[in-house]
């Protein structure tokens, strides 16, 4: 079976960032000019294109770590396609800026920048520490994620990212990420609950097999994501599970079986029971 998964190389030099095997280059100064930075700010460039799993329609993700977010008036002199608040709604007044979006030249690449304060980073670290201390000695199911999607993105993008301003401060902060604890918590979050297996038993016995196929498929995807976390992956978005599995070194039998089952269809009763 040929895995229809594409990866690419990215490079970061002293002056520019090159993505998609050299097809597109973005000057570092362009990213610096688009961000609102003060002397203490840390500018991080990151995202799936930096990882090498993004496509020509993916985005460059930037994080600006700051003491305080800029307000709308502060960034008036910089042209952006979108400026949004914490709920990603367009800003219409002089509010705090949480995110900006820009489109790079005549490419399909867009650049997303999130403003995150240093106290918020510390709160994320604390959340991970507390969650780990609470679950590391028991077997409870985690029905709700510990971190929000934004908080997970901050951790992941900090781990794979590169600093374009205040690199020393970034390296210090990065060294304090409780990475192994974060990975363990992520692993526990994705483990399927026993009640889902009971649903599968019910579907099997009643003949509700299309539903049963969907439940076991969801369980397989979650278990696979959990597995990728244990290998060191911190990208938690569903859509990257194939790329994450593809890039894992070793475990060829597990990877091969996953790719077959993930792409396998089932319509008839025999096919559905075989799949389940």
Predicted features and spans:
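Conserved NTP/Mg2+-binding pocket subregion across the NTase superfamily
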Residues: 3-19, 85-205
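Short amphipathic alpha-helices in soluble, non-transmembrane regions
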Residues: 75-84
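Active-site nucleotide-donor binding segment shared across nucleotidyl transfer reactions
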Residues: 30-73
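Helical scaffold of the NTase/Pol beta-like nucleotidyltransferase catalytic core
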Residues: 1-45
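Residues at beta-strand starts and edge strands
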Residues: 58-60, 107-109, 273-274
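Active-site-adjacent loop/helix micro-motif of nuclease/hydrolase catalytic cores
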Residues: 71-75, 122-125
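Conserved nucleotidyltransferase catalytic core and NTase-mimicking acidic/glycine-rich helix/loop elements
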Residues: 2-7, 168-276
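Short, solvent-exposed loop/turn segments at secondary-structure junctions
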Residues: 50-51, 118-119, 234-235
